[in-house]
Structure formats: C-alpha cells, structure tokens
From Swiss-Prot:
Subunit structure, interactors included: Homotetramer; dimer of dimers.
Cofactor requirement: Mg(2+); K(+)
Lineage: Bacteria, Bacillati, Bacillota, Bacilli, Bacillales
Main location: cytoplasm
GO molecular function (one): ATP binding
Residues bound to K(+): E45
Pathway: Amino-acid biosynthesis; S-adenosyl-L-methionine biosynthesis; S-adenosyl-L-methionine from L-methionine: step 1/1
Stated name of the protein: S-adenosylmethionine synthase
NCBIfam families: metK
UniProt catalytic activity: L-methionine + ATP + H2O = S-adenosyl-L-methionine + phosphate + diphosphate
A GO CC annotation given for this chain: cytoplasm
Length: 399
C-alpha cells in the first residue's frame, strides 16, 4: 500500500561540540553572576579554539565572579581534561574582554526601579524591552513533551551519547559529537517511522569503525528510540567519514549562539534569529522566546490546537509587545483572533512581566545550554509549566 509521505530532519549536538562549549561557558558565567546579583545585566560571548577561550561582552553587576575559574570548571565538566583530547581545561589559556552595558541601552530598560520579586504594576509598565526583535514559540501534540519528534529524538540521542561516555560504558568516546534524525510523516501528518539516523562521535584513535557502529547501535540508538519507529528500511550512518579523532575546539572554533536551531525546534518552526545563551532575562531574545513557548504549549495542552506557533515582537525601551501573532496551522478549535485575545488577557508579555511570571532571575541557564531549551525530560524549566491550561479553556469557553 502506498501513501503520501514527507520526510523532516532535525539535528542536535553533544555538550562537547565547540559551539555548545561556548554556549555552556556563557551560561555558566551568567548563572554564577545571578547567584549573587539577580539584577545583573549580562551579555556574555564565548569563543573557543585550539588551546584557548576568549570571553567578551558587556556585563554590569555588583558582584565579582572569577571568570577563568568558571570557564575551566565548565570545560572540565564537559570532559575536556587531557591534552590528547585536543583541549585541556587546566592548561588552556582564558582571555577576558568585558565592558559595561551601554548607558544608551540601560536608559531604555531601567526606567523602573531595581527588579524585585514584588515588583509593582507601575514598575513593570515602566521597564522597556532591551532591544527590538521578534521571537517565536511552538508546540505540537505529536509527542508527550509537545515537541516535534525529529528534534526530540535528536536531543535524546545526543544526551545518551554523552552519558555512555561519562559513565564509561564506551570509554573510547570523546566529548564532541552530532546526531541527526529524519522522521517520515504520513498523510495524517503524524510520525510513522524513522527513515534515517546519523551519529558522528569523536573517538580514540585505536578503535575500529565496525566496533563503533556496533556499540552506538547497541548502547545509544536502541535503548533510546522506540523500536516501533525502526524497521528494516531505516538507514543508519555512524561516523560516515570513517574517522573522527580530531574534534572539539581543536577541530573547529566554537562561538556562543551558533546553534539556535538546535536550541529550539530543529527547524520545524520559525526562529526570530536571536540566540539565548549568555543573556540575562531582560534580553527579550531569550525571555520572550521562553514566554512564546509557554503560551504555545499551554494552548496545545488545553486542546485548543494540535499545533501552535506564537510570534512576539518588541521595540527597544517599550514595555508592551508591538505584536502578538498566533498560527494554529488550521488545527485550532477556535479562531486565532480569540486565542490572541485570551493570551493578551492571561499572560503578561511585557519584559518585566515575563521575568516575574516565569521567575527568570534564578541561576537556571547552564542546564539549558546543551540538549535544548524546550521539551526537556531531565530538568524542570518554568516555561514548560502547564498551569494556564484551564485558564485558557475558560477564556475561550471550551470545556
């Protein structure tokens, strides 16, 4: 029997990928600052390359952080602890070039008094966005995590790849790695099977490719992927170049913010272009993208749509979003206009309102910097809450 089908592919990378090292370092520095100064302004950029890391950006804070120490501890946690891995947390150089936040930006954000948990309505209204921009959030009912299956499985496989290395199940693996999953969708637009899985993993020099292929299937793919999604036609490409010994920052330079599609929905939904890592929550690139996911997930969980994409947009120095747009891809039970009306009423999408609503001044960001910011099953994140489901149902009068 033949049927119309489509294929969709997403990718993820391990915590040892150069760009993800940079993201984790930037967010580790952010967390360390927020522990003592939740009102800090942080825009921290990291560059990693052979033998060194460069930390740059703008930071305004009342606390002191030993940045080289944070950098070294983060890279050690990832697993780059020996020179033979091409990157050693203890012997690498750490350079810093940090400035304060521009006063021109600060005057647009800081109209309110210093942030407090009991921030008043007047203070919320007086706190403008830190930049202009547009942000997207998305949710779908095709998985229990309300994430598209290709990116969900890519993250699960990438995380498992790191776990078997750290637990020494496969002690010849090294920290760098990438995963790609192609899912076949049927006429009902639901996942039917996995068409292709690609795994590229850094490894010790003395391991044969046949051994790597066997071990990755046995210890990474089969324990992670539902066997019902695999069949005789599923294709596996494991280290398809045949060799992946040189990796990490020795193989490629890494930069904060270069894995924005990995961080979000794997290309399944649109992206506003701004990255997350290294940014404190006054930056709407981060906080509004989290809020948009929060809105979209609650709409889908409420049964008001099978898919939902939310766009928010802001002007620098202005508190209210300049636009809220919702697209349910013809799966909505009510009009998109009614959903927008309900969202405006029940979600505070002003920058300070988002921070208060999602409690974003906490040092929670390092854990988001690898394996995705959304749909996580291993950590609890405030924008993944489903506490607005009944509120939304009541707002649009759906029982």
């Amino acid at each position: 029997m033949t049927y119309n089908k489509r294929l969709f592919t997403s990718e993820s990378v391990t915590e040892g990928h150069p760009d993800k090292i940079a993201d984790q370092v930037s967010d580790a520095i952010l967390d360390e600052i927020l522990k003592d100064d939740p009102n800090a302004r942080v825009a921290c950029e990291t560059t990693v390359t052979t033998g060194m890391a460069l930390i740059s950006g703008e930071i305004s804070t009342t606390t002191y952080v030993d940045i080289p120490k944070v950098v070294r501890e983060t890279i050690k946690d990832i697993g780059y602890t020996r020179a033979k891995y091409g990157y050693d947390s203890q012997t690498m150089a750490v350079l810093t070039a940090i400035d304060e936040q521009s006063p021109d930006i600060a005057q647009g954000v800081d109209k309110a008094l210093e942030y407090r948990n009991d921030i008043s309505e007047e203070e919320i209204e007086a706190t403008g966005a830190g930049d202009q921009g547009l942000m997207f959030g998305y949710a779908t009912d095709e998985t229990d995590t309300y994430m598209p299956l290709p990116i969900f499985l890519s993250h699960q496989l990438a995380k498992r790849l790191a776990d078997v290395r750290k637990d020494e199940i496969l002690d010849y693996l090294r920290p760098d790695g990438k995963v790609q999953v192609t899912v076949e969708y049927g006429e009902d637009d639901k996942p039917r099977r996995i068409d292709t899985i690609v795994v590229s993993t850094q490894h010790a020099e003395d391991v044969e490719l046949a051994q790597i292929e066997k071990d990755i299937k046995t210890h990474v793919i089969y324990p992670t992927v539902d066997k019902a999604l695999l069949d005789d036609e599923t294709k596996f490409y494991i280290n398809p170049t045949g060799r992946f010994v040189i990796g990490g920052p020795q193989g490629d330079a890494g930069l904060t913010g270069r894995k924005i599609i990995v961080d979000t929905y794997g290309g399944y939904a649109r992206h506003g272009g701004g990255c997350f890592s290294g940014k404190d929550p006054t930056k709407v690139d981060r906080s509004a993208a989290y809020a948009a996911r929060y809105v979209a997930k609650n709409i889908v969980a409420a049964g008001l749509a099978k898919q939902c994409e939310v766009q928010l947009a802001y002007a620098i120095g202005v508190a209210e979003p300049v636009s809220i747009s919702i697209n349910t891809f013809d799966t909505g039970k009510v009009s998109e206009a009614r959903l927008v009306e309900a969202v405006r009423k029940h979600f505070d999408l002003r920058p300070a309102g988002i921070i208060k609503m999602l409690d974003l001044k906490q040092p929670i960001y390092r854990q988001t910097a690898a394996y995705g910011h959304f749909g996580r099953t291993d950590v609890l994140l405030p924008w993944e809450k489903l506490d607005k489901v009944n509120v939304l149902k009541d707002a649009v009068e759906i029982q």
